[in-house]
Amino acid sequence: FCCSFPLFASEADLAIPDLHQGTFHIFGSTISAWDFLFYGALVIAGTLGFSLYLFHRIKKLPVHGSMQKVAATIYKTCQTYLIQQGKFLLMLFALVAIVLCVYFFGLIGQTVSVVAQVLLFSVIGMAGSYCVAWFGIRVNTYANASTAFASLRGKPLDVVKIPSQAGMSVGLFLISLELVMMVVILLFVPREIVGICFLGFAIGESLGASALRIAGGIFTKIADIGSDLMKVVFKIKEDDPRNPGVIADCTGDNAGDSVGPTADGFETYGVTGVALITFITLAVPDPEIQAKLIVWIFGMRFVMDFLSGCAFFVNQAISKKLYSKKDQFDFEAPLMRLIVIAAILCISATFFMSYLLIGDMTDSTLWWKLAIIISCGTLAAVLIPEFTKIFTSSHSKHVKEIVTASREGGASLNILSGIVLGNFSAFWTGLLIVALMTIAFFTSGMGLDAVLGEHASIFAFGLVAFGMLCMGPVTIAVDSYGPVTDNAQSVFELSQIETIPDIKESIEKEYGFTPDFEKGKHYLEANDSAGNTFKETAKPVLIGTAVTGATTMIF
């Protein structure tokens, strides 16, 4: 069949427009596309710095020595896991490099310089993915001990604040690093080879995500089942210090629920951006419009990354007002509120920034049509967690049905109930994504082809993926919340802090409060339940984004 795209067009054929020529008129001032991206990247460098500041704050939180030792052991095991994964990634890259060399030299006839650039930026993309994964594990293993110790104060809000800070640190670090890397490629790499560099970058990200996501998911299940087998066979309690599998289980929580999703999010965020840039440069003939749309995409990402950080502060202030004097509250409420606040800010910013940056184009309706499409993705990022909570929350009637089935029907009915519930939840989540993509499809048919060509609907699907990750720091934050709360409970038990002689007097003398061990256990268990729920809410968002973004990339 024939279409308006070049027959063999790909990322390697990208010809990025001259960003010095595109101009924007903002609040009475004129700024070039290049300058807009440069100053936007400086703002994002600030959010990157803020993520490191949050990490520093978590690192300095008070922790009892017994808990610190357990956390250090977990980190050491995580470190061993990541080093092993790094070796595997290098072997995988060597294999892929051979395939790329055969393809570029043998089938396309590219020069050594071109192939070297693809391989170089593949390494950069893979290193970025690996770096984010390592940072996430380091933050989490500081936060788990701090959370466990904070629970002894008898103030439930402290138990929520620390994992939230850790998650936001990881989320802002991931998205900010990705944005800075992509803007550096756009601004400082010669525009004739930007396509090649983006191609290599996307390959490297995908390699990192495929290995870290899949291997992490498998590792956590093996470790979890192994630890449970020890518990069943030897009739010992959960997180018993005599069970060596508990440390492996804690490592698996980080490998499967922190390393995997962060590497996955890093790859999806980057590949979606590359797909949208590819579409714009191939489908839009006018270089000035190309520059405007590319800057619009990054401008939206700059603002949404910043607003995600703002949503964190707003939510912290509301939580302090509501819960600072309470002994009991629903630990899921602050997390869901964070998602809703971020979504409201991001949807508002979508319409504002679209009007500001592309409101003066020939088609005066283009800005709000594109804003509606992006908002469909943002709505998905809010509604998917709500749909998931219906099936995974400790307050869910469906979860209580499985408890009843386990009590009255044994293992077989428990498994059947879980399978039915899982399929049922996937059906509704899938239906939601399809419904929002349908809205985007019909919106793209409202005259967008005049600017974006006859395949505007493909661009619309990419924008849905873009919208789903527009508040990426928050999505990653609520996902990273889970392994911290899960590990915190294990750190508490493994430290055996209650059995240490004169521990109450020691803590009161050194830290200035009398520990309440029973309340601490209760808070950690309730918080673990909330963490388990929300790390499951983030997975469908990341998977849905990956599928939608990949659809755009393929076409």
Residue ranges and their predicted role:
Residues 4-555:
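Hydrophobic packing and interface segments
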